[in-house]
Amino acid sequence: MKFLFLILSCLGAAVAFPGGADDDKIVGGYTCPEHSVPYQVSLNSGYHFCGGSLINSQWVLSAAHCYKSRIQVRLGEYNIDVQEDSEVVRSSSVIIRHPKYSSITLNNDIMLIKLASAVEYSADIQPIALPSSCAKAGTECLISGWGNTLSNGYNYPELLQCLNAPILSDQECQEAYPGDITSNMICVGFLEGGKDSCQGDSGGPVVCNGELQGIVSWGIGCALKGYPGVYTKVCNYVDWIQETIAAY
């Protein structure tokens, strides 16, 4: 059974929703070099609860299971516990979940957030490119977030965490989660365990060769042997993203 966990407070309290998955953090990774992931954003509702990716000056891409009716988006962040000179805050003006998102299966776990006003790009705030094609199995990717860093217990970091991990084959993904993987999902990580995203990373980016190929979605536990992280396959949604942005 999958369980989905959303952070409720800075202390790491979480609530489980039936249907599926563990909303993901970084376990077994490393502290990212300062401001080396300028497309990473923090979604806030009085506290950090999910990640996201800046895809142009006024739009952020995240996971549909991170939905709230009002979201504050923080850009240019590195240490989420302090106010930084690089930090820019925007309210959401429109929040759009994929119309076929399922909270039970987590299929189509993707969401667009329009910022109330555009942001100016800087060394600390830059968009990430959408995929020009789907990445192949074996491609090395960068996962980032402020999620839990322990597979047992809680430790939410101040500084942005990074993890380098490969895309697994469709067969490996299906065998890890029989009957749960749709064509809109990819597995990224290590079957031997020890390295993974986890609670608090949900909605955040998986970037491969400079393109946003995945969104942190779900998994069983964090960094457990045989259970890699599962991510929304962004290359399947480029048309929907572009059409939705054009409509608003």
From Swiss-Prot:
Xref: InterPro entries: Peptidase_S1_PA (IPR009003), Peptidase_S1_PA_chymotrypsin (IPR043504), Peptidase_S1A (IPR001314), Serine_Proteases_S1 (IPR050127), Trypsin_dom (IPR001254), TRYPSIN_HIS (IPR018114), TRYPSIN_SER (IPR033116)
Residues given in the record as Ca(2+) binding sites: E77, N79, V82, E87
Propeptide: 17-25
Bridged cysteine pairs (disulfide): C32-C162, C50-C66, C134-C235, C141-C208, C173-C187, C198-C222
Free-text cofactor note: Binds 1 Ca(2+) ion per subunit.
Site feature (Required for specificity) residues: D196
UniProt-recorded name of the protein: Trypsin II-P29
Originating organism: Gallus gallus (Chicken)
